[in-house]
Structure formats: C-alpha cells, structure tokens
C-alpha cells in the first residue's frame, strides 16, 4: 500500500538525491579506492539508527589484484526480512580528461543532465537509496524487518576483496539478506523500463598449446602448435552448448585474443595462446562446459605431438530470481512512479549480485539508464535520479509495511 507523506514530492527527492550524488561524484574513487564516500554515507545513515562496520580485505601495501579494499556493511534493525541495497563507490578510469565536455570529477549539471564519472554507474543509485531510506524511516520509524546497505570499492576491478568477502563474513555469522536490490544501471530507453532479475554466468579460460620451435623450411623437425590448434578451434567456435530457456539466451563462447609467433616469418613458434570466455545460462553448468571443452580438444590433439593446457577462471555462476515479492515490489513501484510496465531481463555482463544470490536471497538490479556507462561524458538525466529515489522508497513500503 502507498503510505508516503504527500509532501514527498518529486522535487524534494530530486534535490536531495542530486546534492548527495554530487558530493559522492566529486571524490575520484577509481578502483580500488573509496576516497571517503563510505564515510559520507555513514554520516547520513547513523542518525537513522544504522549500525555500521567497515570491512577491510587485501594487502594495505599492495596494488593491483591484491590491493586492500574498503567495504561498508550498515544495518538498521535486527529482524527479518532484511532489505539490502548493494552497490559500489568505485568507478572506472576516466581516460584523457581533456576529452570530456565537463571535467569527469567536477559533477556539474548542464542541459538537464548530471555529468561526471559515476553518474550512471552508480553513485546516483547509492544516493537515491540513501535519500529513499531517510524519508522512509522518517515516515515509518517502526517499520517491519531491517534495512541494510552493502557498499564496496571493488566492483569495477578484480572483485576479489569486495562484496564476495563481505558475504563470506555475513554467512559465517548466519546473517542473511532476504531481498537484495542492486543499484546497477539497468534501464535502457527510459527509467525503469528494464530490471535485471538474473545474470548469466561467466567462465573464462586461457588455452596454451605447446609444440616445438623450428625453421619453417624444416617443418618435419618442428611441431607447429598453431597448425595443431586450428582444427580444434574450428569445432570449438561453432559448438552449440545449449539452447537457453525462457529466461536466458543460449550459452555463448567468444574468443577474445590469439597470441602466437616470434615476429619472424621463418620461425615456427613453440606456443600459441587463446583467450576465451563463456557466458552461460542455467541450462549448462561450469563442469559441463569444462568437460565438453576438454572432449573437443582431446579429440583433435590425440594425433599430434602438440600438447595443451587450460587455465580456467570462474567469475560467477548464473542466477535467477523468479517472480515473487521482490520482483513484484519493483513492478509496483516503477508503475506507480513512472507509469511504465517494466520488463525482466538477464542480459548484460556480471554484477555483484552473483555473490549474493547463492545465499538464498532474492536479487534484482534496478537503476538509471546505462547508455553512457564507462564512456567519456558519462551522464544521467536529472529527472531520473529523483524518480529513482521515489521508486526505491515505494519498494521499501511494499516490502516492509503491513
């Protein structure tokens, strides 16, 4: 039921969300750095009764994959259901700032848009949920259940010391999330037209084929790994892995890199390397993809002196949140605020939802339009950020009242 105070106008939501968005966006929090964004959120959440803890994972002295990551877990209440907003304060690099119409960390309003890195992905989403929570708690201080925020600064990077580690801590102490709203920019043509109720899995591999180096004029004295690879690669690239289902397209395999050769035109190389990636549906498991890949390669390498090995990396399993209370809350809120009948989708890349869904939580991604994410001149419509805060507030009403 809709119980918001009539004074909760779109203008109020918009101004408050805009101000907080700008405060967050002016901090150049390129992965894995948070640059104080999480402290800003704590300052807003603590007066509402949130209890917070910062969780640090990784090496404080390291950089790259092993760098220390700061994470925030903040919660109000200790009862079920737990409605959690999951997001990230880190952003991707800007590239050459001279190519931007407005400097990427100036966070300025122009032509009806808020411009800057993190505008769409995803500091406005964090700001919108914070404002929605402030208004919801003010109007309903004795609401059912709990509200939580899980914020990391390691979503755009390796994603090894961020959400996945926080979830491990929560699981170890049996602290469960019931409904998880991931604030990734899910919308396509208009706010709320698409929500993600699942994501494909991602399985990558580096295939290295080893032969014997030699002179191209004496191939009988060498083993050409490229020649050994080609027949296997031909079959590998056209294999149908599954047909998909009602929620997911068919599993796809794409080759992104092939590296071989010494640079000389008269040398048979010793090795060739192929980088590939599966985006897979719930119709196929990681184990099945690995087994079928090895079956293809074993068949083709059986009659050659070349050998192969694969270095596998699983980035995430596929997940799907069927229609239920969380999806219904999204649909109702979007319809009430925008008049749009939203569409469910599992397209796109991976998100941190892949770490949360295996705990049993219902997970949905809902945020602003994604047309300019990771691009020069990233921006978001000013009108949308206020409406997003309204949508989030309506969802809290649907999930935690009555």
UniProtKB/Swiss-Prot annotation:
Its cofactor is Zn(2+); Co(2+). Gene3D superfamilies: Zn peptidases. Keywords: Amino-acid biosynthesis, Cobalt, Diaminopimelate biosynthesis, Hydrolase, Lysine biosynthesis, Metal-binding, Zinc. Pathway: Amino-acid biosynthesis; L-lysine biosynthesis via DAP pathway; LL-2,6-diaminopimelate from (S)-tetrahydrodipicolinate (succinylase route): step 3/3. Transmembrane segments: none annotated. Its EC number is 3.5.1.18. The keyword Amino-acid biosynthesis applies. It is an enzyme of class 3 (hydrolase). It catalyses: N-succinyl-(2S,6S)-2,6-diaminopimelate + H2O = (2S,6S)-2,6-diaminopimelate + succinate. Zn(2+) 1 binds at residues 88, 121, 184. GO terms for biological process: diaminopimelate biosynthetic process; L-arginine biosynthetic process; lysine biosynthetic process via diaminopimelate. One of its GO terms (molecular function) is succinyl-diaminopimelate desuccinylase activity. Zn(2+) 2 binds at residues 121, 156, 374. The active site is at residues 90, 155. InterPro entries: Bact_exopeptidase_dim_dom, DapE_proteobac, Peptidase_M20, Peptidase_M20_dimer, Peptidase_M20A. It comes from the Bacteria. Binds 2 Zn(2+) or Co(2+) ions per subunit. Belongs to the peptidase M20A family. DapE subfamily. Homodimer. HAMAP family: DapE. Catalyzes the hydrolysis of N-succinyl-L,L-diaminopimelic acid (SDAP), forming succinate and LL-2,6-diaminopimelate (DAP), an intermediate involved in the bacterial biosynthesis of lysine and meso-diaminopimelic acid, an essential component of bacterial cell walls. This is Succinyl-diaminopimelate desuccinylase.
